[in-house]
Amino acid sequence: MGIKFLEVIKPFCAVLPEIQKPERKIQFREKVLWTAITLFIFLVCCQIPLFGIMSSDSADPFYWMRVILASNRGTLMELGISPIVTSGLIMQLLAGAKIIEVGDTPKDRALFNGAQKLFGMIITIGQAIVYVMTGMYGDPAEMGAGICLLIIIQLFVAGLIVLLLDELLQKGYGLGSGISLFIATNICETIVWKASSPTTINTGRGTEFEGAVIALFHLLATRTDKVRALREAFYRQNLPNLMNLIATVFVFAVVIYFQGFRVDLPIKSARYRGQYSSYPIKLFYTSNIPIILQSALVSNLYVISQMLSVRFSGNFLVNLLGQWADVSGGGPARSYPVGGLCYYLSPPESMGAILEDPVHVVVYIIFMLGSCAFFSKTWIEVSGSSAKDVAKQLKEQQMVMRGHRDTSMVHELNRYIPTAAAFGGLCIGALSVLADFLGAIGSGTGILLAVTIIYQYFEIFVKEQAEVGGMGALFF
């Protein structure tokens, strides 16, 4: 059934726009150039407003997810990477549940990637329609069918651009992947802005700067009571404070520390005697994939809950899924879940909220740890990084594990890889929860994604440097 499903969608995949693989080795400086061009296009799209929208001043229902999904409200990047990640989530779950089967052949892998792209385009259209019809840009009846269709087309084209930019980097023209690049850029931009924003906001305590660092100097300069000014700068509510900034730096350091944890399995060449090496199995074996997929799951649950709340606000089942309230609190207006399933799957707003509702905290922790471990464990089966796949790669390189025959390598790798994947996912979830509770800027999930992505780029840089033999050879 699985192979038949992939064969059924094969004709549709053939007509999808595709980036061809490079016919020659792309030099590092060219990769840097293509990566910079990709990032520039993304940032430009983040600033171009959607044509035809009547209003985007209402409370933002996806405010809490925008940093993670690299989206920007009211612009071409309204959907961000959500369609790509959601399609990956769906395909992974289908493959993990054996509803579709993905073989080891390049043909099956190509069909699987094509199916993921096809679903990504379908989801883009679906999300665009939902956003327009739920009144995010104004009353659809007042805007008219023509304007509604125009907004949907703009969102679809922007979604297609994101898909192609991601594929451009994935095919080897650039560094890393588009998804990782866009997420890291968005999160780092948010952290820098929250730390140094010159925007002034009128609070009950008077006019204050949004940026935590600028606010420190402003409060010290304008307040007569310097001790109270310091206290406000470190602990002020509803705006970024210095404790948030310190928590962010602390989480950065902790994640980088854990990146170095790994188990090295001794391997040797089957052809040349005396040639020894090691195969590293990292603690974060699946890197940031679990948290990306978990974010996609939650964001889509938010979309469904918001859509139903707008239309059927008094329905018992809809309220069971999620109840929403608008919050301003000194920043942009946003919607936040205050009841139902969505409330329990979202992080507590503050330390006070943690003490007020411990059940919420317990459910949130269990959900984060469980979902990250599950996604990490199932991801290795569909991404070509399971024990069977690693054993096959080592065999192709004519390498074997010391003290083991070819036939027993899979069994030995199975002792480490699934455990590393599940435990690594669990640790990713735990670090995300810790960052949320400490109040890190950009959310725990966002910080975790930023650090792991930046570390990936550091590893790519080191690898490229080792291949060409020096820093100067990379660029000249």
UniProtKB/Swiss-Prot annotation:
Ranges of the Cytoplasmic topological domain: 1-32, 97-117, 166-172, 262-288, 375-420, 463-476
InterPro entries: SecY/SEC61-alpha, SecY_CS, SecY_dom_sf, Translocon_Sec61/SecY_plug_dom
Side of membrane Lumenal, spans: 54-75, 139-144, 194-240, 310-353
Entries under Pfam families matching the protein: Plug_translocon (PF10559), SecY (PF00344)
A cellular component annotation (GO) from this entry: endoplasmic reticulum membrane
Biological process per Gene Ontology, one example term: protein transport
Cysteine disulfide links: none
Signal sequence, renumbered to the chain: none
Origin: domain of life: Eukaryota
Oligomeric and partner information: The SEC61 channel-forming translocon complex consists of channel-forming core components SEC61A1, SEC61B and SEC61G and different auxiliary components such as SEC62 and SEC63.
Free-text function comment from the UniProt entry: Component of SEC61 channel-forming translocon complex that mediates transport of signal peptide-containing precursor polypeptides across the endoplasmic reticulum (ER). Forms a ribosome receptor and a gated pore in the ER membrane, both functions required for cotranslational translocation of nascent polypeptides.
The protein's name in its UniProt record: Protein transport protein Sec61 subunit alpha isoform 2
Top-level taxonomy: Eukaryota, Metazoa, Chordata, Craniata, Vertebrata
